[in-house]
Amino acid sequence: MKDLKFTTIALCAFALAACMITGFSSWAQKIGVGAKAPRSAEVYFDGSRKMLDEKWTYWKGPRFAGELPVKWSIVKDPVNKGTVLNANDPTAAGGKYGTADIVTKKEFRDFRAHVEFLIPNKGGNSGMYLQNRYEIQILDGDSTKHGLGALINETESPYYAYNGLGKWNAYDVVFRAARFRDGKLVEKAKATVYFNGKKVHSDQEISQVWGGPNSGIDGGNDGGKGITDVPGGLKLQAEGHDVLYRNIWIQELDLDNASTDF
């Protein structure tokens, strides 16, 4: 009887582990350009002005100079049918990041995100910020640790995964927020990133916020190392460049007992 109970418990544990592995592995099969949001995710940009106004706002950081409604424009998709979002807000002309960046009104801790972008011109520059803190660079022509696809200053640029100018690209990310105990940081934030279906960063620890106070939440705290236990939205950066976005969706997660790898 004891052996039967043990066998039953072991089988249940195995089944649970298999389900978790299958769930994560199934994510890897539903990534890249054109990936559709799962039922448990929320769409944050579907090409409409209505959704932009409903779910996004300007990030009002220390350098903020915009004025609502958001001045990012809705334009025709240059590749496929439909409309997309252009990050070229006139307020940010000349590379003035932080003046007209947009962020989701909803804030997050752990999440999975899908963002598609297209850079039409050489040197096109924007950025995707996890929890309005940690930037995944969007910058044509730069393959350094500050370049395209890099978790800025934390990893090398996976430039090899880039589809190139005038083509759609996709970031698929699972992010785990920093953990705190009694108000003290005990675990740094981590992320796994796929770039156009290729895994480029695996369960990568993120040490700090880079770029100073105009970059995002906590950017001005102890040189970006003073991370606080505050959730943040998904932010897109305006630097006065034509960078297009579409098909943005986010799935909230609870990764207390799991890595970000998938």
PLM regions and their residue ranges:
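Bacterial N-terminal signal peptides that target proteins for export
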Residues: 1-13
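Carbohydrate-interacting regions of secretory-pathway proteins
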Residues: 24-262
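Bacterial N-terminal signal peptides
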Residues: 10-23
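Generic short amphipathic/hydrophobic targeting helices enriched at N-termini
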Residues: 5, 16-17, 27
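Intrinsically disordered/low-complexity terminal segments and short unstructured peptides
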Residues: 6-7, 21, 82
